[in-house]
Amino acid sequence: YSAFLIENNSKMNKEFKNFLSRLEKSKDSSKIEATKKRHKLGYRTARENLEHLSDPDSFLEFGEFAVAAQRSRRDYEELQKETTTDGIITGFCTINAKEVGENKANTIGIVYDYSVLAGTQGFFHHQKLDRITEQAEKFKLPIVIFTEGGGGRPGDVDVMTQIAGLNIPTFSNWARLSGNCLKIAIANGYCFAGNAALFGCSDFRIATKNSWIGMAGPAMIEGGGLGVFDPKE
């Protein structure tokens, strides 16, 4: 019996260490170069935006271990490092609970992470977004969303049956929240395509001076034969 406990404790310790390691990979401390790049532009990281938005230790994250649906062409360890959270942080938090009280402070927080595949919208990314908006509708909670990112992502090759992503419910879900859940969107940097749709269909829209917002990014415009443009044009 003692040997059994020792063996299983050893396995549990290993699994727990792996669990903690996975958690650490999604933090800024594990993305030093990406964090430096953000700060050089004068921007915050997604985690820093979340920290400034929510009350200390109030954020309950959903889907932190998600990675891009690209396992058939990229190593899983690489995906854990390079595509943490699949580019979007979602969860529950409170905002200004000391001022308004815990019940009135409950909020859904959604932050696009531009350091992960330019904040593009992938397969599991959309599933996370759909899940958290369903929770917002269920509990009638306000949403604060940071929408920086480049729209739909073409490289999620693990999904064999999806055509242009037009079968996803994300945008109809977002529209259905109107009149039920307050939606506050913040844009900074590049915000194109699906990201811009979420921004434009929010109740309150806040954009920094360094924002470039459009329903089509440079790649889509060029692909449509309309010419080559810089994203800031």
Annotated model-derived regions:
Residues 1-107, 113-118:
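Intrinsically disordered, low-complexity segments enriched in small/flexible residues
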Residues 57-61, 77-81, 124, 159-163, ...:
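Thiamine diphosphate
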Residues 79-81, 91-92, 96-101, 131-135, ...:
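A generic local secondary-structure boundary/capping motif
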Residues 85-86, 119-134:
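Glycine-rich anion/phosphate-binding loops
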Residues 93-113, 128-156:
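A structural preference for short, pocket-lining loop segments at secondary-structure junctions
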Residues 108-110, 121-128, 162-166:
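Glycine-rich phosphate- or other oxyanion-binding loops that anchor nucleotides, phosphorylated ligands
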Residues 117-121, 154-155:
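A generic structural signal for short coil/turn motifs at secondary-structure boundaries
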Residues 147-233:
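Conserved catalytic cores of soluble enzyme domains
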